[in-house]
Amino acid sequence: MNLIKLIKNKLQLKSFDEKVSDFLDKAFLKENNDNLIHNNGNLVREDSKLCVFEHNFATGIYLRRMILARGAYVVGCIHKRDHVWFLLDGYVTVATQNGKQDYVAPYVGFAKAGTRRIVYAHEKTIFQNVFQNPFEYRNLDKLEEYNFSLTKKDYDDFIRSRDIKSS
């Protein structure tokens, strides 16, 4: 195999996580604008033209709602625990390490721990996540730490520490 084919094959072997990480590294170098909103590697909580967030609580549950503008992309964090999500209104394409799929509201989805999603809103969309909140947190920092990892490394560290504690 010649060198060009070898390099080309290696480039194509980048994992979903590596591609997302590369994209985010480049995005964090840019200033927020009408088309790009980020929080320098932390979860975005502030409303913008692209996305509005609502946080609600019920006993043992944290509800995180995103109202996405048509054409908005969201790169989610890695979820530490299984959870349920609802597409209440709209039409989205969701990409994960398993590929991409289109969803039209109404839809109920189940996400496994370790999943990171990239969501594209083809039209105005209401996307509702339902997370565990066994400690009844109301502090978003604590809820995010409990439910999300911002990087693959953080998620892998979480899994290792959980496995050590359960041994």
Label every PLM stretch briefly.
Residues M1-G60, Q97, E145, D156-S167:
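A short, N-terminal "cap"/entry segment at the start of jelly-roll beta-barrel domains
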Residues A72, Y107, T115, E123-T125:
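Surface-exposed loop/turn positions
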Residues Y62-K80:
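Conserved short histidine dyad/triad with adjacent acidic residue
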Residues H79-N98:
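Glycine- and acidic-residue-biased ligand/ion/polar-headgroup-sensing regions
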Residues T96-R117:
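Short acidic-glycine-tyrosine-enriched beta hairpin
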Residues V84, Y91, R116, K124-I126:
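Structural motif
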Residues Y120-S167:
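Double-stranded beta-helix
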